[in-house]
Amino acid sequence: MDKPTTSAAAAAAQDSNLLPDSPQHGPTLSSASSFEALTRHDPNLSRLATKMFNKTEEYITHELNAPLEDYKLLEEMNKATIAKYKDMRQIAENLNTSTSELSLKFQQLAPMMQQIDEISDTVDKLEAAAYKLDAYSIALENRVKCVLQRKSGGGQVAQ
């Protein structure tokens, strides 16, 4: 073998000495692989390895998709919450408008309600006066009857 003439060639030759050797093909690029591409191997082992890699791929795919699904769920929840708050805001605005209208109507009716209260007080006073007048008229009627009975009764006794 020729000796390397450049420092890069020397480093490559030294690195090739550090690589583990394959029993059949010499130095390999992977220290973790015992699989020889051109060598016959156990088909059951190959099937199990393929199944393991497929299951691992499926597991990792689901593990990576789980946060994505969580974010999609959060997004849907946020959209639903936004819609609910929008509805609640509309309801609050409608309530505010209705309350303002009712307050305005109450303010417009307040003088009329005061007049109704005054009329009610006047009617109560008038009713009290009517009862007094009725009592007075009954008393007066009784006096008149007494006077008439005396006149009619006194005149009959004198005859």
From Swiss-Prot:
The keyword Coiled coil applies. It comes from the Eukaryota. One of its GO terms (molecular function) is protein homodimerization activity. Residues 14-36 have a biased composition (Polar residues). The keyword Metal-binding does not apply. Keywords: Coiled coil. GO terms for biological process: autophagosome-lysosome fusion; endosomal transport; lysosome localization. Pfam families: BLOC1_2. GO terms for cellular component: BLOC-1 complex; BORC complex; gamma-tubulin complex. Residues 69-134 form a coiled coil. Residues 1-37 are annotated as: Disordered. Homodimer. Component of the biogenesis of lysosome-related organelles complex-1 (BLOC-1) composed of Blos1, Blos2, Blos3, Blos4, Dysb, Muted, Pldn and Snapin. Interacts with Snapin. Component of the biogenesis of lysosome-related organelles complex-1 (BLOC-1) involved in pigment granule biogenesis. Belongs to the BLOC1S2 family. This is Biogenesis of lysosome-related organelles complex 1 subunit 2. It comes from Drosophila melanogaster. The gene is Blos2.
